[in-house]
């Protein structure tokens, strides 16, 4: 967030004033920001045609990398990432990084998890923009989900881990908080997952349908606090939005989930992202000499903020 104290002598339109202060802004970006309640004049949402005067206060809830886009460094996108990735494990073959909630793994923006990883590798002297191979994501996480992501540093690692993840050899365990206590407290959920491409969501159905894929999720209740439950969840299959949709299908959606969750509770608790963390990765046995040292290793992300709050009964 940026706070501006208006100092202009003559009354000036709000949009013109902001474009003078931040040349990277344009009418399209300003209108989008206003629709999303990201511009407040003296604490209130006001039309962009409103005249601002000396002494007025403007609050902008717009990312700094958008406001400062005119200061962008020439070159590849990773040079403009907001900082290096948080590294959990680094070896000659792979990088395991901890993704914060709200950061996309990749995409058109400069500041993505992959670009932060490339920036880290460049700072370590392991990657340059003209290298033949560019390190690559081996799997993905939803933007609102935090936790561990594997990045291949070599073509051989990329091929091996893409195959191992596709064949479900890499075990993935998550931590999450649900709105509602699941019954029974420990269970394995089955069914089929069906995508609704028009709405950008998935749903769980009991019977096989055209286009539906089998889905299996195992959960274990760690603790409960009021209306909430802290769970450890293992993905047996690995489908789009699997945990989010599966828990919602039994009446216990992930807290903070805007697609499948209880938005009244999300607003009450002021949660912006789903309380879901890719907490643990366990490697399979590798026969390849260059990867044998990784066999059976387990890696953990730091426990998310809500973990201890549920244990202590502060979040309920």
Roles of regions detected by a PLM:
Residues 1-32, 64, 80-85, 201-203, ...:
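Pseudouridine synthases involved in rRNA/tRNA modification
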Residues 47-51, 232, 273:
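Short, surface-exposed secondary-structure edge patches
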Residues 175, 182, 222, 226-228:
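Phosphate-binding site of ATP-dependent enzymes
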